[in-house]
Each structure stands twice: as C-alpha cells, then as structure tokens.
C-alpha cells in the first residue's frame, strides 16, 4: 500500500471505536504515521507549529490506536481509537461540537484553562 502524501502530509480522520463518533481531523506526515504504528498511540504533524506531536502529550487525553484504515484513493487515513478524556483542545469530546450556525451541541468534558495552565496552549 502506497499512502499518497500531498506536500508531505495526509489528512487523518479520527473516530472513537466504541460509538463511531468522529472526534477530529488532523494531518500526519510519514514520521507521524510510523510513530503511530509503532507506539500504538496517535501522532500527528502540526501545520501551524511545524512539528510532530503526540495526542495528549500535554493534557493526558491520549488516543490509543485500535486500527488504521486507508481510503480507496490511498490519500486519507482513518484512525479508529479509544479516546482517553476529550479529543478537542477546547474541552469538548469531539472537535465537531457546533453547527455551522454556531450552535453548540455538546458540553465541555474538561476545563481547558485548568488542563493547559502554564503550558502555552
């Protein structure tokens, strides 16, 4: 299988294995994908910070990998995970917690000000 990286990155959709909720969309480069495969925990590449990161490295809200799938065009990845805590840095279980009209449809799982205090997030 030959993953199609565009500009060195591939989009990664993240889904909770237990209830199939979509948790987030992120990007991985080849190194992040390899770290994910070898460690069993989700790693990504931050486009804004230009660096690798392990999900939960600061918050403790890690994503344990259950399975990694690739789409039919081999240009997108799906991580099926068991999420510890919340996936979104805003404190929501999923990054998809509001409608396009701005209505919040899910409450906070944690207080991000407490979790990321003094960590620069």
Curated annotation (Swiss-Prot):
Cellular component, GO annotation: cytoplasm
Main location: cytoplasm
GO molecular function, one term: magnesium ion binding
Enzyme class: hydrolase
UniProt KW keywords: Amino-acid biosynthesis, Cytoplasm, Histidine biosynthesis, Hydrolase, Magnesium, Metal-binding, Zinc
Record note on cofactor: Binds 1 Mg(2+) ion per subunit.
Binding site for Mg(2+): 71, 73, 75
Enzyme Commission code: 3.5.4.19
Coiled coil: none
Keyword Cell wall biogenesis/degradation in record: no
Catalytic function, reaction form: 1-(5-phospho-beta-D-ribosyl)-5'-AMP + H2O = 1-(5-phospho-beta-D-ribosyl)-5-[(5-phospho-beta-D-ribosylamino)methylideneamino]imidazole-4-carboxamide
Residue spans crossing the bilayer: none
Intrachain disulfide bonds: none
Record GO biological process: L-histidine biosynthetic process
Location in the cell: Cytoplasm
Superkingdom of this protein's organism: Archaea
Pathway assigned in UniProt: Amino-acid biosynthesis; L-histidine biosynthesis; L-histidine from 5-phospho-alpha-D-ribose 1-diphosphate: step 3/9
Binding residues annotated for Zn(2+), in chain numbering: 72, 88, 95
Signal peptide: none
Listed cofactors: Mg(2+); Zn(2+)
Subunit organization: Homodimer.
NCBIfam families given in the database record: PRK00051.1
Biological function: Catalyzes the hydrolysis of the adenine ring of phosphoribosyl-AMP.
Family note: Belongs to the PRA-CH family.
Name of this protein: Phosphoribosyl-AMP cyclohydrolase
Organism: Methanoculleus marisnigri (strain ATCC 35101 / DSM 1498 / JR1)
